[in-house]
Amino acid sequence: TEVHQEYETTKKFIDNFPDSKNDYAPHEKSMKLMPLATHIVEIVGWPEIMLNTEKLDFAAGDYKPLHFTSREELKAKLDEFYAKSQNALSQLSEDGLNGKWAMYMGDQLLADFTKYSAIRHALNQLTHHRAQLGVYYRLTDIPVPGSYGPSADEQYM
């Protein structure tokens, strides 16, 4: 499945994560490397949340950011979140994808999706942020794994 393929690609990026550069950011407005990688790992767990809830309300504290300090923590959580998402997806009927899922900030509706659209959005977010991580890697001379084919680093290995 696409979720599995995106997990495998994400795993390659997390396997290359440099523990020595947790606080690196290419610009003052950019996320630091560890929070970016943490966010990517969290996104892999979003399908499970989206399938087992009807909404997420930031104001109510439904989202609690994770804080990691090492590649090993990232890898462990990535595997855990993937397993939970795969389990939720395996128990889902096709009709279940038509259910509603929304994001709120208190009374303000931020996003209103079908469960299918919410998962599709999560996969888009995963691709977007993983590409950011690839730029960070390139700027710090860390090998960039290929996502949908070999990267420049892999072509010459």
Walk through the language-model features, giving the residues of each.
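Active-site rim elements
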Residues: T1, S70-K75, R120-L123
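A structural signal for well-ordered alpha-helices, especially hydrophobic packing surfaces
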Residues: I14, V44, Y82-L89, R130
